[in-house]
Amino acid sequence: MATLTNVNDKIIAQRALEGFTEYLHPMNLFSTSYSDETKNKGDTIIVPLVGTLTATTFNQDYQVGGGTLTAVTINLNVHKIVPLSLTDVQFANSSVAQLEKWGFQAGQALATAITQHVFSYVTSGSPSFFNTAYTYPVASWNVSRIATIRQAMTVAKVPMDNRSLFLDPTAYSQTLSDTNISYAMYAGTNDALREGRVPRVYGFDIRESNLIPTTDTMYGFACHPSALALAIRALAPQAPSAYEAAGVVTNAETGAALGMRRHYQPSNGTHYLNFEAIFGATYGITAGLSRIAFR
């Protein structure tokens, strides 16, 4: 089986993994299953939902059925690739910096495609699983709205840890410029001013995203990891020996992995590189996510 033994292959694959991991990071706020094991399209993965265990009274027996972990089954039914072609001269003479740039962009593009797929489950155009619970005009969005959302989620018994709030650039900018955030900055953190980054607010990790679907004028959503589940695997090549290089690179910390394969076409002197993953997503617990829109 061909592997990633060529120095250039290793460089570009490693940078692709770094771009993939960095841009996939927001997906860690959902229930996920990542692994370096290869799978085929159509295979299924069982993913436990975060925060669904419950306690039961001990009755002199540890073999009890209570406390069963809720899980969902995900079909790996989506296959995305990021293609890159280089002539043999380009490939041989590419600088390390160029290879790193191409690799990072390829990983970023693959992670973006996965994020867009997961976010499509939040729209009302998909099965009516989540409610549009909050209908604030975008112009009126501020930190006090987050406090209202927090209270409603707590009353609905959504776990109080691991909550996150995704906002489009407009709503995020208004959060960033809110005077309460400014006061917090003066109290000790200058992330808002220096990095343009909103810190945690009222128990929520605040995330800016320009990938939030605008269906029904949605501009954000509040969620718990139990709301959505995602599984990602590398695709197993059908004929590994047919490639100049083929392999899987894995992030040791998160387990996120992507596949890379390269083949050469002598007729036009071109190397074809493809970075890929197969994945799937599904709904978890209804109360775990609420859309925010202006109507």
PLM regions with names:
Residues A55-F58, S94, Q174-S177, A184, ...:
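Short helix/loop capping segments that flank catalytic or ligand/cofactor-binding pockets
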Residues Y186-P237, R262, S267, N274-A277:
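A structural signal for small-residue-enriched, beta-sheet-centric alpha/beta enzyme cores
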Residues A2-V7, T57, F91, Q105-Y136, ...:
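Signature of extracytoplasmic/envelope-associated structural regions
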Residues A252-R295:
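Extended, compositionally biased alpha-helical segments that mediate assembly or anchoring
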Residues P127-F204:
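Extended, solvent-exposed, turn-rich assembly/linker loops in the middle of proteins
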Residues M1-L76, A293:
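N-terminal "assembly arms/tails" that initiate or stabilize quaternary assembly
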Residues L4-L17, T21, A236-A239, G247, ...:
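Surface-exposed molecular-recognition determinants
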Residues V47, V72-N131, A156-P169, I206, ...:
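Long, contiguous amphipathic alpha-helices that act as assembly "spine/axial" helices in icosahedral shell
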